[in-house]
Structure formats: C-alpha cells, structure tokens
C-alpha cells in the first residue's frame, strides 16, 4: 500500500518513521510540504500531484 502524508512536522515525521521501522507492507510514497521545506524527493508542495497520483491508496493528514 502506498500512502501520502499531508504535512511533515513533528507528527508527519513520526508517522513516516514508524511506517519505515514497523510496517513493511506500507510505503510513504508522497509528502505534502511547504515549498521552502522540500528536502526529500518524495515531497511536493502541490496537492494536486498527490490526489491525481493513481498509485496513492491512502492520504493521511498529519
């Protein structure tokens, strides 16, 4: 399952870490973040990139 996180503050980073460490069947594929904070290739500041991606199964607001 591929998910997208909306936000990458304290909660978003924690969710990403837990999924990487403990949930092998789930991948954080996209992350919505502010334009000046795009530090990871999974990140975008354009919400439409996430909602139009057919590979995203679940969107999580963090």
Where are these regions (language model features)?
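N-terminal Rossmann-fold NAD(P) dinucleotide-binding loop
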Residues: 12-13
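NAD(P)-binding Rossmann-fold cofactor-contacting core
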Residues: 21-41
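Glycine-rich Rossmann-fold phosphate-binding loop(s) that bind the pyrophosphate
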Residues: 8
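Hydrophobic Val/Ile/Leu positions in short beta-strands of Rossmann-like dinucleotide-binding domains
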Residues: 3-5, 61
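Rossmann-like NAD(P)-binding element
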Residues: 36, 48-62
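Short acidic-hydrophobic, aromatic-tinged amphipathic segments that line or gate anion-handling sites
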Residues: 42-47
